[in-house]
């Protein structure tokens, strides 16, 4: 019976520094997949609060705010689905973020792929709480979970949220996704599943997009932010992205594209860190007065309500949370045609999909929407309907439930 199933969710949250730009950009220090993994930690901690098995959630350094949205809600859904739910924590702030109806379990912080104290702790938790499934969402979690479950009947489910290259010649991958003891892999996007299908049977993979609850933007709607000096009738484009030392985020192309736009009504608001060279590029072109680089802001999402467009100009990316946040605010989206990001937007219905690494394409797409405010508004409305229909927590948790039950029944 489902009630008798115990599930352990191992999540290693990246530490979040002061002044992160938005929910999208938490945990960026880890590279390409770090944004996605930190965001996915929210999804699974929230899912744990609603699925209902014994959940061990959030092994590693967590952040109260990061744990709080997707994580707490999903945890609630797991509980409602009749799983006995446990959530692990490493800091007091994380402990406080755990819902009252879920038992917290303290675990040591770890980042290495082999950490003996952590492995011992996981084995003890498995025995004490009769865990049947471990859901590990990054490489360190997965590796330590595989070591900890040796000699047990516990099934390990992994997660992949990035298209970073996998090399069979690199033996460390056999401590993770290429290990035959991984019972199933959850993939954030269809593109990721297709990439992994070169190494893993499609039957052992499930696409489970990260959910988003529009209610998470209530505070942003209640306390919206604006940029001083931008006229009320301006066409405002927002970009939420930490780009310092990350040229693949496409900020340079976005700035170059802005300099190609002659419409004086178009203003760009960038929130997040950036390289000095990009700032200088913004100041040295014809659109300098219309490019507003606000830096790191904890209230970054508060700049979305009431704006016209949210743009993701990345050359490569995962599945940006900023696009979900924009859709929840009924803001039209422009996204480059790259794996992951393009799955969020329906071209010509909720926004525009453009070729990557092209200032000209950026300028043309912004210009098209600036000249057609009715279409821009319609895109925003359609995006809102898409987020509340296709990216629900209920669908996300149901997919987890199905996979957990599937691996247990084998």
Language-model regions, residue ranges each:
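A short, well-ordered alpha-helix in the C-terminal region of glycosyltransferases
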Residues: 361, 368, 375-390, 396-405
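Short hydrophobic beta-strand element within catalytic cores of glycosyltransferases
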Residues: 332-335, 345
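Nucleotide-activated donor-binding/catalytic signature segment of Leloir-type glycosyltransferases, i.e.
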Residues: 280-297
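A conserved, positively charged/aromatic
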Residues: 156-183
């Amino acid at each position: 019976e489902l009630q008798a199933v115990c599930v352990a969710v191992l999540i290693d949250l990246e530490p979040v520094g002061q002044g992160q730009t938005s929910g999208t950009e938490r945990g960026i220090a880890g590279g390409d997949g770090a944004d996605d993994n930190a965001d996915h930690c929210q999804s699974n901690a929230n899912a744990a609060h609603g699925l209902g098995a014994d959940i061990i959630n959030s092994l590693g350094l967590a952040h109260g705010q990061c744990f709080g949205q997707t994580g707490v809600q999903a945890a609630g859904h797991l509980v409602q689905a009749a799983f006995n739910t446990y959530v692990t924590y490493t800091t007091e702030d994380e402990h406080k973020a755990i819902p009252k109806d879920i038992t917290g379990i303290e675990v040591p912080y770890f980042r290495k792929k082999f950490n003996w104290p952590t492995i011992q702790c996981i084995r003890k938790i498995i025995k004490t709480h009769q865990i049947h499934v471990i859901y590990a969402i990054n490489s360190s979690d997965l590796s330590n979970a595989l070591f900890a479950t040796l000699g047990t009947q516990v099934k390990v489910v992994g997660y992949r949220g990035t298209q970073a290259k996998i090399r069979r010649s690199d033996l460390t991958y056999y401590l993770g996704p290429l290990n035959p003891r991984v019972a199933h892999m959850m993939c954030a996007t269809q593109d990721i599943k297709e990439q992994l299908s070169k190494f893993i049977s499609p039957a052992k993979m499930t696409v489970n997009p990260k959910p988003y609850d529009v209610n998470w933007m209530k505070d942003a709607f209640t306390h919206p932010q604006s940029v001083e000096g931008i006229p009320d009738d301006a066409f405002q484009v927002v970009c939420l992205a930490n780009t310092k030392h990350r040229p693949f985020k496409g900020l340079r192309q976005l700035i170059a594209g802005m300099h190609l736009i002659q419409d004086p009504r178009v203003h760009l608001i960038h929130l997040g860190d950036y390289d000095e060279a990009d700032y200088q590029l913004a100041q040295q072109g014809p659109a300098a007065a219309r490019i507003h680089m606000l830096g790191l802001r904890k209230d970054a999402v508060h700049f979305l309500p009431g704006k016209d467009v949210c743009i993701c100009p990345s050359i490569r990316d995962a599945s940006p949370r900023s696009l979900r946040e924009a859709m929840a605010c009924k803001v039209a989206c422009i996204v480059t045609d790259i794996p992951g990001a393009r799955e969020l937007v329906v071209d010509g219905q909720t926004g525009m999909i453009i070729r990557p690494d092209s200032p000209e394409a950026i300028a043309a797409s912004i210009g098209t929407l600036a000249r057609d405010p009715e279409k821009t508004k319609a895109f925003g409305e359609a995006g809102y309907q898409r987020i509340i229909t296709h990216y629900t927590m209920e669908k996300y948790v149901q997919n987890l439930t199905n996979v957990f039950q599937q691996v247990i029944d084998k």
